[in-house]
A protein has these predicted regions:
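N-terminal loops that bind phosphate or other acidic moieties
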Residues: 1-39, 49-50, 54-168
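Glycine- and acidic-rich phosphate- and metal-coordinating loops
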Residues: 46
Length: 168
């Protein structure tokens, strides 16, 4: 959790009333949040787990699905990567290595924009209209890699809640 706070500068969110660790169970967390009547969720996760959301995989445990390189390679191809780059991404062992390949060929930002659009699509589809939902994806090496469209708004709402709660 410390790397998350460092990567996205969230030391104010140490309050357990506003943070919940959901492990690999993104889909179940969304379903439970709707049942509990929550208004919104801002997920913050490492690229190694959250890239799977761009394929609609809502349980990110490696036993359920490991499509990390496939997702990054497809989005690289969609953003104009040549076959050598796509193969290089597919041959990577971990997302840190894949991000390095994408950064070296100048595609990291475009690929992450494309990935974030798909993450938003699947999160919104799972949440329905009952829940505002957003995600921030980071890596330990690169920091924040991408955000969905409602991430800043949900971040601000949560920050306001924490400040009001603390009487500031």
């Amino acid at each position: 959790m410390q790397s998350v706070k460092k990567a996205v500068c969230l030391p104010q969110f140490r309050d357990e009333e506003v943070t919940v660790k959901c492990s690999n169970y993104i889909g179940d967390t969304i379903d439970d949040a709707k049942l509990l009547g929550m208004k919104g969720i801002l997920f913050i996760g490492h690229i190694g787990k959250f890239v799977k959301l761009a394929a609609g995989v809502m349980n990110t445990h490696s036993r359920q699905a490991d499509c990390r390189m496939e997702v990054l390679a497809v989005h690289a191809a969609l953003e104009g990567a040549d076959s050598h780059t796509v193969r290089s991404v597919m041959d990577c062992v971990n997302t840190s290595e894949a991000l390095r390949v994408l950064k070296e060929c100048g595609l990291l930002e475009k690929v992450m924009e494309s990935v974030m659009e798909r993450i938003e699509f699947y999160l919104t589809n799972r949440a329905g209209e009952a829940l505002d939902i957003a995600a921030v994806v980071f890596s330990n090496e690169e920091g924040v890699l991408g955000k969905t469209s409602k991430a800043d708004s949900l971040f601000e709402q949560t920050s306001r809640f924490v400040r009001q709660k603390k009487g500031r």
